[in-house]
UniProtKB/Swiss-Prot annotation:
<feature type="modified residue" description="N6-acetyllysine">
    <location>
        <position position="264"/>
    </location>
</feature>
<dbReference type="GO" id="GO:0032777">
    <property type="term" value="C:piccolo histone acetyltransferase complex"/>
</dbReference>
<dbReference type="InterPro" id="IPR028651">
    <property type="entry name" value="ING_fam"/>
</dbReference>
<dbReference type="GO" id="GO:0043997">
    <property type="term" value="F:histone H4K12 acetyltransferase activity"/>
</dbReference>
<keyword id="KW-0804">Transcription</keyword>
<feature type="binding site">
    <location>
        <position position="406"/>
    </location>
    <ligand>
        <name>Zn(2+) 2</name>
    </ligand>
</feature>
<feature type="binding site">
    <location>
        <position position="393"/>
    </location>
    <ligand>
        <name>Zn(2+) 1</name>
    </ligand>
</feature>
<comment type="similarity">
    <text>Belongs to the ING family.</text>
</comment>
<feature type="region of interest" description="Disordered">
    <location>
        <begin position="129"/>
        <end position="164"/>
    </location>
</feature>
<keyword id="KW-1017">Isopeptide bond</keyword>
<keyword id="KW-0805">Transcription regulation</keyword>
<dbReference type="GO" id="GO:0051726">
    <property type="term" value="P:regulation of cell cycle"/>
</dbReference>
<dbReference type="InterPro" id="IPR019786">
    <property type="entry name" value="Zinc_finger_PHD-type_CS"/>
</dbReference>
<keyword id="KW-0007">Acetylation</keyword>
<feature type="binding site">
    <location>
        <position position="366"/>
    </location>
    <ligand>
        <name>Zn(2+) 1</name>
    </ligand>
</feature>
<dbReference type="GO" id="GO:0000786">
    <property type="term" value="C:nucleosome"/>
</dbReference>
<dbReference type="GO" id="GO:1905168">
    <property type="term" value="P:positive regulation of double-strand break repair via homologous recombination"/>
</dbReference>
Amino acid sequence: MLYLEDYLEMIEQLPMDLRDRFTEMREMDLQVQNAMDQLEQRVSEFFMNAKKNKPEWREEQMASIKKDYYKALEDADEKVQLANQIYDLVDRHLRKLDQELAKFKMELEADNAGITEILERRSLELDAPSQPVNNHHAHSHTPVEKRKYNPTSHHTATDHIPEKKFKSEALLSTLTSDASKENTLGCRNNNSTASCNNAYNVNSSQPLASYNIGSLSSGAGAGAITMAAAQAVQATAQMKEGRRTSSLKASYEAFKNNDFQLGKEFSMPRETAGYSSSSALMTTLTQNASSSAADSRSGRKSKNNTKSSSQQSSSSSSSSSSSSLSLCSSSSTVVQEVSQQTTVVPESDSNSQVDWTYDPNEPRYCICNQVSYGEMVGCDNQDCPIEWFHYGCVGLTEAPKGKWFCPQCTAAMKRRGSRHK
């Protein structure tokens, strides 16, 4: 029953052996590279001076160069043999581990039948992550084209997570249509605050679709969505240029990091989301309008203190109406900005919610500096620092034919070409 202790004692010297052999392999690799560089220089000098010297000198130099080439080839073969020895060493230890595990399993089964299956299942449950990490999957059943990048190598597929293909029309159309309905109902009737309030009540009496953005619940109203989008766009604009993204993931992160609390604003049920959401939104609008009006009047001195309450109420209602109209117009502007900046959004069912949780250690790609998802294309420049790009970020809809270079590499090649001219 001391299999683990024996195996640990056996592999105690393995790291040192591997380090010594890898060091020797690196030295041999450098030796071969230096020899090849020197031989290339000798060959170039040989061809430059071949016509000036006698045939005997040419034969002698040719034989010397061949001899040195064979010496470099022998060193390269020795390096390959050393790599094979390292592989055999590690493989031998792995086979030993499998044998010890099989013996240990037989002893456990002899004492308690079926105990190994229970232990293995429990170990798998402990090793499994608490939340699914994979958010985006490409269709694994489709053949991978030459220029397409398959991101499933970076994600572990699970059976209970449906495959999602990201498009911009699904969520964007719902967002803009509901916002345009609200602006039409709430902003055309600009005579008083009551007309705008009635428009919100009419709009909120209809059942609203679920938006499925993280913890965003259904029935929140398009006005609240546009206000949240405004704060998200503002937070995204303040990010560094390399960290901006063309998907709604940055907007969702801005929702979470901003003062606009989604958990409190959108946690109401569908039954009570009709009138309560519209009244809460109208209260927010009137409070903002009254506060702005109070700030604008703070620098003035009141010359007449005997105004009637009806005049004050009418003036406050008119200012509230104008501020509400300005907020409605700004909301529509924000929706347009979001529709321009957004290129990929998830296509999901109305009953499911998108899980935006991803591994922070996962490699980033593309000019948007995001993880791999959907269809990706690779730059044919071997020195490209980014290498892989999302189709939507570089304006592609299908795999390019022939060689393809990213915008950065294309601009760099144009600069080099103009410099040579």
